[in-house]
């Protein structure tokens, strides 16, 4: 057959419709997703990512959070991008293996100022979990309504687990008494890493390079040893149903969970400031 003949046959073949059986076969075998394609959302607000996008999000958000540890949105994105494929499933399985954890997964409670009104929490007994939580929120000037919604985790149930961890974070602060400035956050993140194994909490420790030398020395000599003891020795905090123990004595809860309360970071910093002030005054008088 000549070249012209082959071209003519090809044109005719393209113009002829496919048999119905062939069309059905093609329709029943859709093209598989590649690392460059993006799957469909699996729940409201879900932003599915392909492998390349997830890797870029993990690296970009981690670097951005290191440059500015106060960027909660970058920390949240890094947490979601690095939690799969293993770590968030491990946390979900820990909840499934615990009676209280299973109840939380069934009920799916949310922690907001609507579900836990601050006036009610402030009215609870002095040393209760709820009153301690409210006092910590008031002292630090933060709100439970500022947590970002999870959107980069593909499994819908695991997305809730990450959301639950995120919303319980302030309860961890309240029970340990750690403040929200960088030194306090790093101490708590070290504790959370050893308790939850979420990679972002461990990666946060790189932000220690931004601390002042005295703060870094204090973190490594006082608070990291505490984080190791309490993080490894405590129960899975993701399985605590905080909403049901608001009236419980907070010291009793610490004993049950195996959490040792760390030295008061704000008090230590206050004492150091006063000591420096007295030293300056002494030197000034000596002149």
From Swiss-Prot:
| Keywords assigned | Lyase, Membrane, Metal-binding, Mitochondrion, Mitochondrion inner membrane, Transit peptide, Ubiquinone biosynthesis, Zinc
Cofactor(s) needed for function: Zn(2+)
Q: Where is the transit peptide?
A: 1-40
Q: What is its EC number?
A: 4.1.1.130
Q: Which GO terms describe its biological process?
A: ubiquinone biosynthetic process
Principal subcellular localization = mitochondrion
Catalytic function, reaction form: a 4-hydroxy-3-methoxy-5-(all-trans-polyprenyl)benzoate + H(+) = a 2-methoxy-6-(all-trans-polyprenyl)phenol + CO2
Residues the record lists as binding Zn(2+): 169-170, 173, 185
Subunit field text? Component of a multi-subunit COQ enzyme complex, composed of at least coq3, coq4, coq5, coq6, coq7 and coq9.
Q: Which family does it belong to?
A: Belongs to the COQ4 family.
**Protein name in the entry:** Ubiquinone biosynthesis protein coq4, mitochondrial
Could you tell me which species this protein originates from?
Aspergillus terreus (strain NIH 2624 / FGSC A1156)
Q: What is the lineage of its organism?
A: Eukaryota, Fungi, Dikarya, Ascomycota, Pezizomycotina
């Amino acid at each position: 057959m000549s070249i012209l003949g082959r071209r003519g046959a090809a044109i005719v073949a393209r113009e002829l419709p496919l048999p119905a059986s062939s069309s059905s076969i093609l329709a029943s075998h859709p093209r598989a997703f590649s690392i460059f394609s993006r799957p469909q959302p699996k729940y409201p607000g879900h932003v599915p990512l392909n492998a390349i996008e997830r890797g870029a999000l993990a690296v970009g958000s981690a670097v951005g959070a290191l440059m500015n540890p106060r960027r909660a949105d970058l920390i949240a994105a890094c947490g979601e991008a690095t939690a799969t494929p293993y770590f968030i499933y491990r946390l979900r399985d820990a909840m499934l293996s615990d009676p209280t954890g299973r109840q939380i997964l069934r009920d799916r409670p949310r922690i907001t100022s609507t579900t836990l009104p601050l006036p009610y929490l402030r009215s609870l007994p002095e040393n209760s979990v709820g009153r301690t939580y409210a006092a910590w929120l008031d002292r630090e000037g933060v709100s439970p309504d500022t947590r970002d919604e999870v959107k980069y985790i593909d499994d819908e149930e695991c997305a809730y687990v990450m959301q639950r961890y995120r919303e319980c974070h302030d309860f961890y602060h309240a029970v340990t008494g750690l403040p929200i400035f960088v030194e306090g956050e790093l101490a708590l993140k070290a504790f959370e890493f050893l308790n939850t194994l979420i990679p972002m909490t461990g990666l946060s420790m790189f932000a220690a390079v931004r601390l002042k030398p005295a703060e870094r020395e204090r973190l490594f000599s006082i608070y990291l040893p505490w984080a190791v003891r309490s993080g490894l020795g405590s129960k899975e905090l993701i399985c605590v149903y905080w909403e049901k123990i608001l009236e419980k004595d907070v010291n009793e809860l610490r004993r049950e969970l195996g959490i040792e309360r760390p030295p008061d970071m704000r008090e230590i910093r206050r004492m150091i400031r006063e000591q420096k002030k007295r030293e300056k005054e002494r030197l000034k008088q000596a002149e």
